[in-house]
């Protein structure tokens, strides 16, 4: 069997709270090949593996995916899901794909930068994207910076490689 726990700030979180999934069991891997630092970051000495997924557990023990921990943008004291921003803005018919990342702000936290790839033959601009964001997102979740790009980097599995967008 596999054990699962939802952790936040060093403790198991209560139902309804968002926390990180950790798993432990005989089929959980023992570490990354030739990457001891990464293994130490994600595999606790007692065998609990930190998956990097943030979820909320309800009273019936069902888990609801929130986002990947690496996709959290810290802005004005709030944890904001980059995936939520990407989904909301990416629904614009003239946007082929987009990706939000956190960039350093003068306040020591992060501002939201959104990289946007336009669909071929469209005339979308950062101003249009800003106006759309006002319709779709609360003020705290709206990108401060919008840059139009020809393409976004992807991983081998064709997911957007946000880590390659970081300045």
What do the PLM-derived regions correspond to, one by one?
Residues 4, 20, 25, 30-31, ...:
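AMP-binding/adenylate-forming catalytic core of the ANL superfamily
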Residues 13-16, 30-34:
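Active-site glycine/GP-rich loop and adjacent strand/helix microenvironment
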Residues 47:
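A structured beta-alpha segment of the ubiquitous adenosine-cofactor-binding alpha/beta core
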